[in-house]
């Protein structure tokens, strides 16, 4: 009986540790490919700060890059992670990018398993580059490498 209990405990531990935490190989390969990022012209609505990331809420007329479920949503939520968050946060806090402003974003629009990976890799307005695509993508890749899944 003790062996069965121990075996069940070990199996439970393995499943717990191999859960959905971190970025697996499929996720890392997809999100590091620059061809999987789409340019979106949007109107900035608002943002929220959450732990180590930002959520940007935008409106866009052209939702072809997004999942069909987004077509009925008035706003789309995009996520800013890692160093990209550190780079962009002050522009939102200082209202350099404010409600109603036109902004061009380059972001992933990938849904994998049960998660939305709408990650912002570039942000610019007509006259200002807030985050370059090269830096933004490099920061996303670094963030994923620092947060790999066990399997």
What residues fall within each predicted segment?
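Beta-strand/loop nucleic-acid-binding surfaces
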Residues: 68-95
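Structural detector for short beta-strands of small beta-barrel domains
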Residues: 34-62
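Bacterial signal peptide processing site
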Residues: 21-23
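C-terminal partner/receptor-binding element of secreted or periplasmic proteins
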Residues: 118-151
